[in-house]
């Protein structure tokens, strides 16, 4: 009759049967041997992993196995990209020379930025003198509208606009005529003036019958 060999206990059982196996597997010695066996395997595997990592670090100069990260930085941040410590704040940007930022390269028509005080500074070629300085010219006056006194001639070949009533300029298209002086803001002529609307006759005027006379 074949015998059963227990790998944990390294012994042969008397005979191969379910009752004998069950009795052996529930024994105290067998359980202790099973625990020791798996603990020994776990320690051996852990030690082998530690040895392989140590040897790889020693062979590659403490390099790591991840090719996506930079060399000599096992899982860290590349130099120059470290984060500041908490509470340190963001470092300020370095100031530009002269206080003005340089022009962006590649911009069309980019000219160098003039130094501070170039505009209006005396002795600078091309500088604009400040108002009131010797040789400074003020802003050119606004030209008068066509038709106003002192206005230049209009477009050649185009007759000048006709003056309005009273010598006033011609009103714009769709606009009302300008009222004469003393008429206020009301554009209509006063009663009795030429071209005014006839006024209503007063009550009881000659030629007007009593109220209701036209109903007879």
Curated annotation (Swiss-Prot):
GO biological process terms, semicolon-separated: mRNA 5'-splice site recognition; spliceosomal snRNP assembly
GO molecular function terms listed in the Swiss-Prot or TrEMBL record: mRNA binding; pre-mRNA 5'-splice site binding; U1 snRNA binding; zinc ion binding
Q: Where in the cell is it found?
A: Nucleus
Major location (coarse): nucleus
Under the heading Pfam families, the entry gives: zf-U1
Q: Where is the composition biased (Pro residues)?
A: 140-149, 157-204
**Per its UniProt record, what PROSITE patterns does this chain match?**
ZF_MATRIN (PS50171)
Q: Where are the zinc fingers (Matrin-type)?
A: 4-36
Keyword set, alphabetical order: Metal-binding, Nucleus, Ribonucleoprotein, RNA-binding, Zinc, Zinc-finger
The ranges of region (Disordered) come to 70-89, 125-216
Could you list the residue ranges that cross the membrane? none
| GO cellular component annotations of the record | commitment complex; U1 snRNP; U2-type prespliceosome
**Family matches, as HAMAP family:** U1_C (MF_03153)
Q: How does it assemble?
A: U1 snRNP is composed of the 7 core Sm proteins B/B', D1, D2, D3, E, F and G that assemble in a heptameric protein ring on the Sm site of the small nuclear RNA to form the core snRNP, and at least 3 U1 snRNP-specific proteins U1-70K, U1-A and U1-C. U1-C interacts with U1 snRNA and the 5' splice-site region of the pre-mRNA.
What role does it play? Component of the spliceosomal U1 snRNP, which is essential for recognition of the pre-mRNA 5' splice-site and the subsequent assembly of the spliceosome. U1-C is directly involved in initial 5' splice-site recognition for both constitutive and regulated alternative splicing. The interaction with the 5' splice-site seems to precede base-pairing between the pre-mRNA and the U1 snRNA. Stimulates commitment or early (E) complex formation by stabilizing the base pairing of the 5' end of the U1 snRNA and the 5' splice-site region.
Which family does the entry's similarity section mention? Belongs to the U1 small nuclear ribonucleoprotein C family.
Protein name stated in the entry: U1 small nuclear ribonucleoprotein C
Which organism is the protein's source?
Neurospora crassa (strain ATCC 24698 / 74-OR23-1A / CBS 708.71 / DSM 1257 / FGSC 987)
